[in-house]
């Protein structure tokens, strides 16, 4: 029900915001398109909790205690604009996994891993993040572009953990000392935000892009910020940027919070 409520709200907004595009643009204005491919290399932090299917206490661990290995990424953006109105679609897929031994942070059944004990942990995390937004260009000058936007962010995260606690384990129930569990989340959030760029230099070939959005829905709060430096070519542009994406999630969620923070590089083709 929550998901359908957010989808319905977005569809109402999209109908109101995007249908007038044809009247805002003159007959002489044509569609402009942009497609971007990029690499993002974030540090991942957060806190996750797993409930073993066979019973026993929950196993909790900080995501950043384990994950430091980006196995596979697929990322891209598509932009379509006519006149002052347009549509933006951004897609991120990340497959992340790692194994670590000697882990002492974390809890099992609500109790910290005891002194003299440690865990060997194998954690895999797969995430799809889609952002779809309509936007309106409020400023369209050679040096300055500025858009207001609103839309939806869809997040699908699946994670799996294997753990084995050794050492001083007398205080840990036998059932909790080793285990395998899976947990995940599927979120819909409504977002609002702004983006733009400032061009400078000879023929305005250098530019500073920026983006900010904030939203809520299934998440208590999600927000994203991007800033960087780019250079324009006849076919499009190349950009180096810093990107931060944050989720503050309900306390009863399998993932209590999650943050992605790091550099990104990419190219955009325009036609």
Residue ranges of model-derived segments:
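Transmembrane beta-strands of outer-membrane beta-barrel pores
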Residues: 39-43, 63, 82-84, 91-97, ...
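Cleavable N-terminal export/targeting peptides
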Residues: 1-30
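Predominantly the C-terminal beta-signal and adjacent terminal strand-loop region
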Residues: 225-271
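Residues on the lipid-exposed face of transmembrane beta-strands in outer-membrane beta-barrel proteins
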Residues: 35-37, 76-82, 132-136, 150-152, ...
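Residues that define the transmembrane beta-barrel architecture of outer-membrane proteins
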Residues: 29-31, 70-74, 126-130, 144, ...
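Short loop/turn motifs that connect adjacent beta-strands in outer-membrane beta-barrel proteins
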Residues: 22-31, 139-145, 200-206, 235
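Extracellular/periplasm-exposed beta-strand and loop segments of Gram-negative cell-envelope proteins
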Residues: 43-71, 93-128, 155-187, 217, ...
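Short glycine/proline- and aromatic-enriched beta-strand/turn motifs that initiate or cap beta-hairpins
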Residues: 24-94, 201
